[in-house]
Amino acid sequence: MKSKFKLTTAAAMLGLMVLAGGAQAQDKPREVLTGGHSVSAPQENRIYVMDSVFMHLTESRVHVYDYTNGKFLGMVPTAFNGHVQVSNDGKKIYTMTTYHERITRGKRSDVVEVWDADKLTFEKEISLPPKRVQGLNYDGLFRQTTDGKFIVLQNASPATSIGIVDVAKGDYVEDVTAAAGCWSVIPQPNRPRSFMTICGDGGLLTINLGEDGKVASQSRSKQMFSVKDDPIFIAPALDKDKAHFVSYYGNVYSADFSGDEVKVDGPWSLLNDEDKAKNWVPGGYNLVGLHRASGRMYVFMHPDGKEGTHKFPAAEIWVMDTKTKQRVARIPGRDALSMTIDQQRNLMLTLDGGNVNVYDISQPEPKLLRTIEGAAEASLQVQFHPVGGV
């Protein structure tokens, strides 16, 4: 009898708890998570750090920071070996990535994804042929035309071609097979739909797209450099109508695309006799940049260079005047591997794989403003949010 009373009492108490829980649930409506948020910093303060996370490459991501204070603003996932760029109008974030059905195996799907730049929310994906380049984050592997209408990307199957994507229509337009044997995409800022690529014969191929994104015309320059004797880095210091390339041995070659055909020039050397005696050479990934208003070019350099050190981090950053072809400043390199320049605000970002350094470059000698520490696990690319055109 006593045991029965206890069971009855327990059942009554449980019933009261359920009723109370129901009443409480009615008092507090269920929260619905819709995803996304509004990025707190203004667009002009944002920078994008492409984190390859080498130790778990299927989880690459883009970190967004406020460069003025180092605040973390958000993240965009980019799956396996992602690449990123921000649309020229600053409204969208474009990523290029690969998915496999079983993460590390299974059917492969290559896509370009479009994300809202203010909310960091996914909008759409554009299917690609399963041959987009899978490599480190060089700027020239994933670009867009100056008018912003087309994404231009590097393919490697391993045969090389360049893919054209119509962003508005969400279509893969075509393969530019004329770019076989050529590598990287260099948009020409003075033309709406033109770009160059570096070819295996030491020359440059220029492709002009029509309004439909198909090849309208093309031309090849004469040989600019010797692939065997003086190979160049694919990262250019890019002006409105000229591109400067540095070689593994510290020479500079230039390509002028102000006219109908590209005219190549060079080389001239970054090095004086003392530099040569110490074997100073360039090194890094996105290792050069140009401040267009002043004509100053920034190059990552290290001493004791030899075969195989072309990706060594910067011992120093050299500032070269491209008009006089003289060095005007040199500062500690802070082991940087990549850089980017903001033309409107006279700023430079450098990246050592994890930390981002912010410099004022309004004067010949760059001034370090701040360092954003631990910005990524393993990053080789950093970008400003576009402000005031390309």
Curated annotation (Swiss-Prot):
UniProt: substrate binding residues: F54, L57, N81
The Gene Ontology terms for molecular function here are: aliphatic amine dehydrogenase activity; aralkylamine dehydrogenase (azurin) activity
Provide the disulphide bond pattern. C182-C199
InterPro entries from the xrefs? Host-pathogen_enzymatic-act (IPR051200), Metamine_DH_Hvc (IPR009451), Quino_amine_DH_bsu (IPR011044), WD40/YVTN_repeat-like_dom_sf (IPR015943)
UniProt organism field: Alcaligenes faecalis
Cellular component GO terms, alphabetically? periplasmic space
Signal sequence, renumbered to the chain:
1-25
- The protein's name in its UniProt record: Aralkylamine dehydrogenase heavy chain
Question: How is this chain's activity regulated?
Answer: Irreversibly inhibited by phenylhydrazine, hydroxylamine, semicarbazide, hydrazine and aminoguanidine. Reversibly inhibited by isonicotinic acid hydrazide (isoniazid) and isonicotinic acid 2-isopropyl hydrazide (iproniazid).
Question: Which function does this protein serve?
Answer: Oxidizes primary aromatic amines and, more slowly, some long-chain aliphatic amines, but not methylamine or ethylamine. Uses azurin as an electron acceptor to transfer electrons from the reduced tryptophylquinone cofactor.
What are the record keywords, sorted?
Disulfide bond, Electron transport, Oxidoreductase, Periplasm, Pyrrolidone carboxylic acid, Signal, Transport
Q: What is its EC number?
A: 1.4.9.2
Q: Which residues carry this modification: Pyrrolidone carboxylic acid?
A: Q26
**Catalytic activity field:** an aralkylamine + 2 oxidized [azurin] + H2O = an aromatic aldehyde + 2 reduced [azurin] + NH4(+) + 2 H(+)
Q: How does it assemble?
A: Heterotetramer of two light and two heavy chains. Binds two azurin molecules per heterotetramer.
State the family named in the UniProt similarity comment for this chain. Answer: Belongs to the aromatic amine dehydrogenase heavy chain family.
The places in or outside the cell where this protein is found are:
Periplasm
